[in-house]
A protein has these predicted regions:
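Conserved non-transmembrane functional hotspots
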Residues: 31-217
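Membrane-embedded hydrophobic alpha-helical segments
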Residues: 1-44
C-alpha cells in the first residue's frame, strides 16, 4: 500500500466505515423488505387457496345434506309406517332439476376438492346417472314409489359424501395445498361396480319395473 493511500485511509477511516455501515444497513434493509414481501405474497396465496378449497367442500356438504331430506307420501308402507322417500324424487322433473344442479355445483370447484372427495362425488354421480337411466322407464307419478324403495341408498350416499368432504376441514385445511391433479379422480372400476351392485336401486329395480308392466294402462 502506498504511503499516500495509507495516509488517506487513516485520515478518513471514520467516514469510510460510516459509509460502509450505511451501505451495509441499506442492503440488509432491502433484503429484509424483499423477504417480508415474499412472505406476505405467500400468505395471501395460501389464503386464496384455502378460501377456494373451503367453498368447494362446503358446496359438496350442502349437496350431501339435500340428498337425505325425506318427505312423506301420507300413505302407510308395507311395514305399517308412514312411507317416506327423498324429496328430490317427488317427480321426474324434481329429480332432473336437482341432478342438473348437482352436476353444475360439483364441477364448479372440483379442482379444489381433495382426491378422496372427488372419488366419492364421482361414485355418487355414477349412481345418479344409473338412476336417471332407469327413470326413463318409470312414469312420473310412480317416481316416488321407487323413491321409497331406494330411500336407504340416499341416506348412505349422503353420509359417505358428507364424511369424506368434512374430513378436509379436520385435516386437509391445514395443508393449504390442493391435491395433485394427476391423481385419478374415480375409484377403481371393481370397487365402483361392487358398490353399485349392493345398492337398493340395482337390487330392486328389475322387480319394480316388472310390477309396473303388470299395471293396467
Amino acid at each position: 500500500m502506498s504511503p499516500e493511500l495509507e495516509q488517506f485511509l487513516n485520515a478518513n477511516a471514520s467516514a469510510i466505515f460510516g459509509l460502509l455501515g450505511a451501505l451495509g444497513g441499506g442492503v440488509l434493509s432491502f433484503v429484509a423488505a424483499l423477504l417480508l414481501k415474499r412472505s406476505e405474497f405467500s400468505l395471501q396465496l395460501r389464503s386464496k387457496i384455502v378460501d377456494r378449497q373451503i367453498a368447494a367442500h362446503e358446496r359438496i356438504l350442502k349437496l350431501a345434506q339435500e340428498m337425505r331430506v325425506m318427505v312423506s307420501s301420507g300413505m302407510l308402507g308395507a311395514d305399517g309406517e308412514v312411507a317416506r322417500g327423498p324429496r328430490i324424487l317427488l317427480s321426474k322433473d324434481e329429480f332432473e332439476s336437482w341432478f342438473t344442479r348437482f352436476t353444475e355445483q360439483q364441477l364448479e370447484g372440483s379442482t379444489w376438492l381433495t382426491t378422496a372427495t372427488k372419488r366419492e362425488v364421482a361414485f355418487v354421480q355414477d349412481y345418479l346417472v344409473t338412476l336417471h337411466m332407469h327413470l326413463a322407464d318409470v312414469p312420473s307419478e310412480k317416481c316416488f314409489d321407487l323413491a321409497q324403495l331406494i330411500r336407504q341408498d340416499f341416506i348412505d350416499l349422503s353420509n359417505s359424501l358428507e364424511k369424506v368432504a368434512f374430513a378436509f376441514f379436520e385435516t386437509g385445511i391445514h395443508r393449504a395445498r390442493p391435491d395433485s391433479l394427476l391423481d385419478w379422480h374415480k375409484y377403481k372400476r371393481p370397487v365402483t361396480e361392487q358398490r353399485l351392485t349392493s345398492t337398493a336401486l340395482l337390487q330392486n329395480i328389475a322387480e319394480f319395473k316388472g310390477t309396473l308392466s303388470k299395471v293396467p294402462k
